[in-house]
């Protein structure tokens, strides 16, 4: 790395992200091409973006880092072309692209030249989607048309204090100003829109990206994410049954060495998504959650066990990513139905359809563990046998059926007294809602003790390692 790159924030971020001494800069001599509005008199070293390649824990990655000291990091024609060139090289080599964003927007002096070059970058990103992992980190401003860049990538991180992400500025939204709701903040973009996967300090973000890169395959055909497992494959998870409410904790218990890389942690907390390791293999995990516990074992948030529109879309996008990169999927199902609210009713049917389609369309190994309730169409949506799960396990106290047994008894025996309803509810639960009943019908493969979950899911994924599954010939789905 040249002195220019090493001495400013953009270069320091690259040095902190990559293995020491591994970065090689490309296009360091490029400058702005336009001469309009006296641009030739302005210094534009590297045209405001450092581009090149290096390694993270030995894995090849391509990186671009915007330099806010050059025209405030504003994007011009050559700036965008440099990033596009990095994408071309990454696609040839089958390696991830990481973008470190700190930008004031498009250069007005370059107008359509900048727009054309940046439009081509959108196209490069679109073609790279599902082929190589794309990761964005926002350290400064990412506004207007640039906000499409993180939306086109797979994972986005945002500096908690200085990061700003918006399509329209908060003050440009009718009836709003930044004092009412800072729609550009890391909190809003991570908790409300779900566009941001993680927030924190600059150091935290770079560390999270390093961890994520090590969990992911380098492209959709080759997988360098496998590693030796030193954890006991048959390890008993004695307290796993007590963690079924907060499945982020449950997934941590199941994983090799308790490694869990959660994504979109602050968004739609009723649904958990992230990556775990099972026998050294990266597995994508999707799980319903009814409670969120903090490090002091205190309840931070509580949900009713239903599937929300936001949660369904969050899970659907994650499953589609896993399928694109041949990452097996594990689900922990504990769902009582669909969330009933005016907000959810606007989108729940479409959101549930997207999740159903994502599971049904995925050809990767899919394993489901029913850890609690599994009622109605929401259960079917959550990676059931019906939509394509390869293996389904259930804990002994799971309930699988149309609805809660008490509700079913009240509907079927509406005129009966309370004692009769209790009797019929117990009968209904035994005949229609027990895991044994589902297993007799072939909807559950094996009833397992909660403590043995780790060894069973590892065994299932080992068995499914060479899975091959065909799909009807078509250009693409339309859900």
Task: Please tell me what each predicted stretch does.
Residues 1-479:
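Ligand-binding clefts of soluble mixed alpha/beta catalytic domains
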């Amino acid at each position: 790395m040249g002195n220019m790159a090493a001495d400013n924030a953009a270069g320091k971020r690259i040095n902190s992200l990559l293995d020491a001494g591994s970065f090689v800069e490309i296009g360091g001599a490029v400058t702005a091409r336009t001469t309009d509005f006296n641009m030739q008199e302005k210094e534009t070293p590297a045209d405001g973006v450092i581009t090149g390649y290096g390694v993270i824990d030995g894995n090849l990655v391509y990186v671009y880092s915007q330099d806010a000291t050059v025209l405030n990091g504003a994007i011009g024609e050559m700036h965008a072309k440099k990033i596009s060139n990095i994408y071309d090289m990454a696609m040839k080599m089958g390696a991830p692209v990481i973008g470190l964003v700190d930008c004031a927007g498009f250069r007005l002096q370059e107008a359509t030249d900048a727009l054309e070059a940046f439009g081509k970058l959108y196209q490069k990103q679109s073609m790279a989607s599902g082929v190589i992992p794309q990761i964005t980190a926002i350290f400064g401003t990412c506004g207007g048309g640039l906000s499409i860049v993180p939306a086109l990538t797979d994972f986005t991180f945002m500096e908690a204090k200085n990061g700003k992400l918006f399509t329209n500025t908060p003050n440009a939204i009718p009836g709003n100003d930044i004092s009412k709701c800072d729609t550009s903040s890391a909190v809003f973009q991570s908790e409300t829109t779900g566009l941001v996967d993680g927030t924190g300090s600059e150091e935290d973000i770079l560390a999270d990206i390093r961890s994520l890169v090590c969990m992911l395959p380098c492209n959709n055909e080759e997988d360098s994410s496998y590693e030796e497992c030193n954890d006991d494959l048959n390890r008993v998870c004695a307290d796993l049954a007590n963690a079924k409410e907060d499945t982020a904790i449950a997934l941590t218990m199941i994983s090799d060495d308790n490694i869990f890389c959660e994504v979109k942690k602050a968004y739609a907390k009723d649904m958990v998504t992230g990556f775990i390791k099972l026998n050294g293999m990266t597995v994508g995990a999707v799980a319903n959650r009814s409670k969120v516990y903090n490090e002091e074992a205190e309840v931070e948030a509580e949900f009713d066990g239903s599937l929300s529109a936001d949660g369904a879309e969050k899970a659907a996008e994650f499953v589609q990513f896993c399928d694109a990169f041949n990452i097996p999927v594990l689900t922990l199902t504990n769902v009582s139905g669909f969330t009933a609210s005016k907000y959810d009713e606007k989108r729940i049917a479409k959101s549930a359809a997207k999740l159903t389609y994502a599971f049904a369309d995925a050809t990767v190994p899919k394993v489901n563990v029913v850890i609690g309730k599994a009622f109605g169409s929401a259960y079917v949506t959550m990676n059931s046998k019906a939509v394509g799960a390869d293996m389904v396990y259930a804990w002994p106290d799971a309930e699988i059926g149309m609805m809660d047994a008490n509700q079913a008894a009240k509907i079927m025996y509406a005129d009966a007294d309370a004692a009769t309803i209790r009797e019929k509810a117990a009968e209904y639960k035994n005949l229609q809602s027990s895991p044994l009943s589902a297993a007799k019908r072939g909807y559950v493969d094996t009833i397992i003790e909660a403590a043995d979950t780790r060894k069973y899911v590892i065994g299932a994924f080992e068995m499914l390692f060479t899975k091959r599954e065909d799909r009807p010939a078509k250009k693409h789905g339309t859900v």
